[in-house]
Regions:
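Repeat-solenoid scaffold signature
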Residues: 1-29, 72-74, 80
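Extracytoplasmic/secretory ectodomains and luminal regions
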Residues: 27-229
Length: 229
């Protein structure tokens, strides 16, 4: 059912194995590829439900909302594996890498973030071992910059519904697949919130993020200047 595997336990309940889309794409060509990026199922723009406890061993493990990006590596590459999420204008919204984040804080001459890219800030590391991998993007922009690597880039605003691309790069090889982030159908049915409303909300959130990043950078540079004086 919609690339999910649904199992019935003879009247006692249903179990669903989520998103088997890669199995529907298997072919001799895919199996013989050194690297392959699978199609991405269109995700819904949903907020994760709050959990007050971990599920028990017999309880279902519900996936968090987001886009699942599946890719295959026939062997572990020697260089970087990079995944970029692009919007309809071709701008990089989020970037993920197999390389470890640099622990050193690099300051620019400017007191403002300026053209600094937050797209890769605070992102989890991409796996690059041989085999199949499923990576989950939470549909969020990067959050505000922080001098702490553990906090930098976290909890950013969710992206606007619309068309996006996932671009996987390994060395000189790259592949792009398109997908659409869909509006929460419950919100669409109510009709009280439009895409234009969401766009305005996200723009304001990004403006606040950038202002907070500028403020934190200014404080960090003042601390650096004081330490070197």
């Amino acid at each position: 059912v919609s690339q999910d595997l649904v199992l019935s336990t003879m009247g006692r309940g249903f179990w669903i194995l989520y998103n088997l889309l890669p199995l529907h794409e298997v072919s001799d060509e895919v199996a013989g590829s050194e690297v392959h990026l699978y199609e991405v199922r269109n995700p819904y723009r949903l907020y994760a439900a709050r959990r007050f406890r971990d599920p028990g061993p017999d309880e279902p493990q519900y996936p968090n909302p987001g886009a699942r990006v599946d890719y295959y590596l026939a062997s572990e590459p020697s260089g970087e594996v990079r995944l970029e999420i692009l919007n309809a204008n071709g701008d990089v919204v989020r970037a993920f890498s197999s390389e470890q984040a640099n622990s050193a804080i690099q300051f620019s001459d400017s007191i403002r973030m300026g053209n600094w890219s937050l797209a890769g800030a605070g992102t989890p590391q991409l796996p690059k071992t041989a085999g199949m991998h499923r990576f989950a993007w939470d549909l969020r922009h990067a959050g505000p910059w922080s001098q702490s690597l553990q906090q930098s880039g976290g909890n950013g605003p969710m992206v606007v519904p619309g068309l996006y691309q996932a671009r996987l790069s390994v060395g000189s090889w790259s592949q792009v697949v398109s997908f659409e982030v869909l509006m929460d159908p419950r919100i669409e049915e109510e009709g009280t919130v439009t895409v234009a409303n969401v766009q305005a909300q996200v723009k304001l959130s990004l403006d606040v993020r950038n202002a907070l990043s500028d403020a934190r950078l200014a404080v960090a540079k003042l601390d650096e200047a004081q330490a070197n004086s």
